[in-house]
């Protein structure tokens, strides 16, 4: 097991926001490549948020795989348990639908938002039932100004209300 000398993504958010775009995109590419590797093995993370370790020099590693389950688990199970940190949980999961690969993509959109804001999504609100309802009605974090349009468009696609419209 590798030691994460630079802590977690969450503990480095303020530094990440200050990074040049090329570094942010390199880090996000590293994260989505790790998630793709999990998905290629037909697993769903189910608790994807700032639990990403910064091993060294922009080499990131997804951690906290304790709730990770095979895709088939949700296809054959009536399990409607909700795992994770509220703003990172996809709206369809909050409505009782099973986790899917696209649920993790929704979570990735919140990580994208953290990279440009430096704070947790909805950091100034209680993580409660009302926020769950609001997310299910389409509430998303406020778009930060002066962010490249292509980045915003991708982030919005990843947090689309319809999981079938999210990139995979």
What does each of the following model-derived ranges do?
Residues 14-29:
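Activation segment of protein kinase catalytic domains, centered on the conserved DFG
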Residues 159-168:
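A conserved short helix/loop substructure at the end of the activation segment
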Residues 78-93:
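Conserved activation segment of eukaryotic-like protein kinases, specifically the C-terminal portion
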Residues 104:
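Conserved catalytic-loop aspartate of Hanks-type protein kinases
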Residues 39-55:
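Catalytic-loop of the protein kinase fold
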Residues 2-8:
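Conserved short submotifs of the Hanks-type protein kinase catalytic core
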């Amino acid at each position: 097991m590798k030691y994460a000398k630079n802590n977690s993504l969450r503990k480095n958010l303020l530094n990440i926001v200050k990074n040049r775009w090329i570094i942010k995109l390199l880090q996000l590419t590293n994260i989505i490549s790790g998630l793709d590797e999990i998905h290629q093995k037909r697993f769903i993370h189910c608790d994807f948020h700032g639990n990403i370790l910064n091993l060294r020099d922009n080499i990131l590693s997804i951690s906290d795989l304790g709730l990770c389950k095979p895709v088939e688990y949700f296809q054959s199970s009536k399990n409607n348990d909700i795992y994770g940190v509220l703003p990172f949980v996809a709206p369809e999961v909050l409505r009782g639908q099973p986790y899917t690969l696209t649920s993790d993509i929704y979570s990735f959109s919140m990580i994208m938002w953290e990279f440009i804001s430096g704070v947790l999504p909805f950091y100034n609100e209680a993580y409660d039932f009302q926020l769950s309802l609001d997310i299910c009605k389409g509430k998303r974090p406020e778009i930060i100004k002066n962010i490249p349009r292509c980045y915003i468009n991708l982030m919005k696609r990843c947090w689309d209300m319809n999981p079938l419209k999210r990139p995979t």
